[in-house]
Amino acid sequence: MEKTKSKTKCLKILLLVIAIIVCIFIAIVTRRTIILSEIDKKVTELENNSNNFYMKTTFIDEKNYTASIERYIKDDVSKLVMEKTTPDGKNAKITEITYPEKRKMFTEVNGVKVMHEYNEKTAIRGAHIEKQTESSYTTISNPAYSMSKRELIVNAIVTSIKTKKIDGKDYYILSSKMNTNFLYNTNTTKMTIYVEKDTGLTTKIVEKVNENGEIKEIYKDFEYKFNNVTYEDISEPDNSEYKMQENS
């Protein structure tokens, strides 16, 4: 009889411990889900409602290559400027300007300049577009983007979220190696993303990669400016300096 009571008591304690663990897990996942949802909402509002902004991303990869991507948005024109420099000083530059009905690309590699022009209806810019019938693209980094509630909850489970004050601003620090929305390299072991709490904007990404058994880091820094892009900023390079290449 005493043994039965003892077993019953142990079982109740075990069930209580399991219930507490489950409650803690649910509370943690709920908090993460709310935070990711808030970030997604803020970035989506910026993406869909901002028609004049500048964004720059600077990369330093595990092989010490440096690259920068600048994006200029003004009205219905998007200009993308990508530059990459190797450790030995070689430089490549691509400028792509997207209009509603055409796209022009200017490449410059080792001093050779080539221009391509594509006469085609281009994708529209926007996130979470309801009743979408055309292809779309986004420009602002959104580590919390999700296509469904299920995806949001799964990412909340596999993503650690901490808060930290940096230079007087509050940040969310998102870390994961399984988040379906993070853009990993094939040898990535972990990615950490710094998100400004007030705006939802990503300001820094640190990606740890396994390079032949050695853990190295890739850094991406983000800079944003709103409502200061001019028509000169989105202008084309001098076409006369480029050789026109026919597109097949």
What residue spans do the PLM features occupy?
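Beta-turn initiation residues at beta-strand->coil junctions
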Residues: 58-62, 82-87, 106-111, 178, ...
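Flexible, processing/modification-adjacent segments and terminal tails
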Residues: 32-39, 106-170, 176-181
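Short, hydrophobic/aromatic-rich segments at coil-to-beta transitions
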Residues: 49-56, 75-81, 167-175, 201-204
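An acidic-aromatic
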Residues: 70-140, 217
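Aromatic-rich beta-strand edge motifs centered on tyrosine
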Residues: 70-73, 96-100, 193-197, 219-229
